Amino acid sequence: MNGDDAFARRPTVGAQIPEKIQKAFDDIAKYFSKEEWEKMKASEKIFYVYMKRKYEAMTKLGFKATLPPFMCNKRAEDFQGNDLDNDPNRGNQVERPQMTFGRLQGISPKIMPKKPAEEGNDSEEVPEASGPQNDGKELCPPGKPTTSEKIHERSGPKRGEHAWTHRLRERKQLVIYEEISDPEEDDE
């Protein structure tokens, strides 16, 4: 089994909590008062452990993730003079796109619509590259569609169409169907 699933298994009453889980709980406990922590169920504690792990994983990947709400209070206390002055990564941070926990799965590039051609110019401009490889040659001839245009031509069904409509094809040969009678009907 996966080691991260250790939190999902609930320890039996009187059993010792494994050291790994206890350490994770201790990391989270510092964000809550003692009364809040003792009132919390084990499932809530596990939820906060996973939330903190997600936040740390996203920041390691370079995303500027929103700080989980339970961590905001502690971060505000740190800002008043504790750890932020001694943080070695503080000056080395690079501006990255801001992500929230739920949006990580739905990452997709935004496609901007093409601007309409000006009235006086009917032909589309083709980008040119200069350099030793191309020497001013056109990247794509004006008559042929680009790869992105081909993709957009073959894209899936439009809104309102049935999902399988674009996959249906006509038969090349005519098929003749015969009606088959049931043997029970013939007996009567």
UniProtKB/Swiss-Prot annotation:
Pfam families: KRAB, SSXRD. Residues 147-164 have a biased composition (Basic and acidic residues). Keywords: Chromosomal rearrangement, Nucleus, Phosphoprotein, Proto-oncogene, Transcription, Transcription regulation. It is found in: Nucleus. Residues 20-83 form the KRAB-related domain. GO terms for cellular component: nucleus. Residues 1-80 are annotated as: Interaction with SSX2IP. Residues 25-80 are annotated as: Interaction with RAB3IP. Disulfide bonds: none annotated. The record marks 110-111 as: Breakpoint for translocation to form the SSXT-SSX2 fusion protein. The modification Phosphoserine is found at residues 108, 123. Its main location: nucleus. The record marks 68-69 as: Breakpoint for translocation to form the SSXT-SSX2 fusion protein (rare). Expressed at high level in the testis. Expressed at low level in thyroid. Not detected in tonsil, colon, lung, spleen, prostate, kidney, striated and smooth muscles. Detected in rhabdomyosarcoma and fibrosarcoma cell lines. Not detected in mesenchymal and epithelial cell lines. Coiled coil: none annotated. SUPFAM superfamilies: KRAB domain (Kruppel-associated box) (SSF109640). It comes from the Eukaryota. Residues 76-188 are annotated as: Disordered. Belongs to the SSX family. It is linked to A chromosomal aberration involving SSX2 may be a cause of synovial sarcoma. Translocation t(X;18)(p11.2;q11.2). The translocation is specifically found in more than 80% of synovial sarcoma. The fusion products SSXT-SSX1 or SSXT-SSX2 are probably responsible for transforming activity. Heterogeneity in the position of the breakpoint can occur (low frequency). Interacts via its N-terminal region with RAB3IP and SSX2IP. This is Protein SSX2. It comes from Homo sapiens (Human). The gene is SSX2.
